[in-house]
Curated annotation (Swiss-Prot):
It is an enzyme of class 2 (transferase). Belongs to the methyltransferase superfamily. PrmA family. The keyword Cell wall biogenesis/degradation does not apply. Its EC number is 2.1.1.-. The gene is prmA. Keywords: Cytoplasm, Methyltransferase, S-adenosyl-L-methionine, Transferase. The keyword S-adenosyl-L-methionine applies. It comes from Picosynechococcus sp. (strain ATCC 27264 / PCC 7002 / PR-6) (Agmenellum quadruplicatum). Its main location: cytoplasm. This is Ribosomal protein L11 methyltransferase. Methylates ribosomal protein L11. CDD domains: AdoMet_MTases (cd02440).
Length: 296
């Protein structure tokens, strides 16, 4: 059965890009792409018709406009129309290009022919309807932090990936040499996407294990403590997860947390401190940041 999709087109001030991106993700959009259009920025986002009606989309448009007013920026122009499955995949895919991240990785859309030679590690990806194309600052911050963390003796590292989405951080860790990853996501579509991206990158199933669930699911998948934890979810959710992280960690476990806006640094830092974690480094990209943490 084919799905009909809403295509939302949002023409906005470029500085609203990140806020809109997260609003759309929170709303449940699957697949988003953005491009510069003169002085403005055009975001396209897609979601199955069956999940939303006109009223939902009108409410979303109102929220986006309110965000702009609060930020003292011009209101975005929001339009939507229906497209069929074929147009959805070709439209979205044509807007997503290979992207170099850090010094070693190249994110490579699954539908492009693989180059015969690449200086970089090719991370092939078809996120389907899951979050994680590598285009978002928070994913990039996590991949760059992983590159640093896995610089020495990566082959000993077993990593927990909480909120794995498309599986991008698990696959990135394994390409950088990690021993094994265990990913969880509350969204079953993310589990499906992670598994097909694992296969796309020729990674053995036992090296990259994925299940539907959250942090409490991880000990059932791997009963030992993890060497590293990556988690790129919204700050409000991370605050709920931090008190549970010690249960899956050992004294020298490291963590990489993102999905955090700069103004949310303090509550995250306080929660980490209260739960026995120290901040080793804090990296920023635009208004997003990424905590590199270790046990106290
Ligand atoms: C921002 S995406 C990150 C995807 C990918 N790891 C990346 O870095 O691009 C966050 C993911 O976390 C999942 N998620 C949200 N709340 C969660 C929770 N409490 N436990 C596990 N996963 C969760 C969402 O379904 C989504 O796939």
């Amino acid at each position: 059965m084919t799905t009909t999709w809403w295509e939302l087109q949002i023409l906005c001030d470029p500085s609203l890009e990140e806020t809109i991106f997260w609003r759309l993700d929170d709303f449940g959009c699957r697949g988003m792409a953005g491009e510069q259009k003169g002085q403005s920025y055009l975001i396209r986002a897609y979601s199955p018709q069956a999940e939303f009606d006109h009223l939902d989309l009108a409410a979303l448009a109102l929220l986006l406009k309110q965000d702009a007013v609060l930020a003292h920026l011009p209101k975005p122009v929001v339009k939507w129309h229906l497209i069929d499955e074929e147009d959805w995949s070709s439209s979205w895919k044509s807007h997503w290009q290979p992207e170099e991240i850090g010094d070693r990785l190249l994110i490579y859309p699954a539908w492009l022919e693989v180059p015969t030679h690449s200086e970089r590690l090719l991370l092939r990806l078809d996120p389907g309807s899951a979050f994680g194309t590598g285009a978002h600052q928070t994913t990039q911050l996590c991949l760059e932090a992983l590159e640093m963390r896995l610089g020495q003796q990566p082959e000993t590292q077993v990593i927990a990936d909480i909120g794995c989405g498309s599986g991008i951080l698990s696959i990135g860790s394994l390409l950088l040499g990690a021993k094994q990853t265990f990913g969880v996501d509350t969204d079953i579509l993310a589990v499906t996407a992670s598994n097909s991206n694992r296969a796309l990158n020729n990674i053995e199933p036992e090296r990259m294990v994925v299940a539907q669930g959250s942090i409490d699911t991880l000990p059932k998948m791997y009963p030992e403590p993890f060497d590293g934890i990556v988690c790129n979810i919204l700050a409000e959710i991370i605050i709920e997860l931090i008190p549970k992280m010690s249960a899956i960690a050992k004294p020298d476990t490291w963590g990489i947390l993102s999905g955090i806006l700069i103004e949310q640094i303090q509550p995250i830092a306080d929660t980490l401190e209260q739960n026995g974690w120290a901040i080793a480094a804090l990296w920023k990209k635009d208004e997003w940041c990424c905590f590199n943490i270790r046990r106290n």
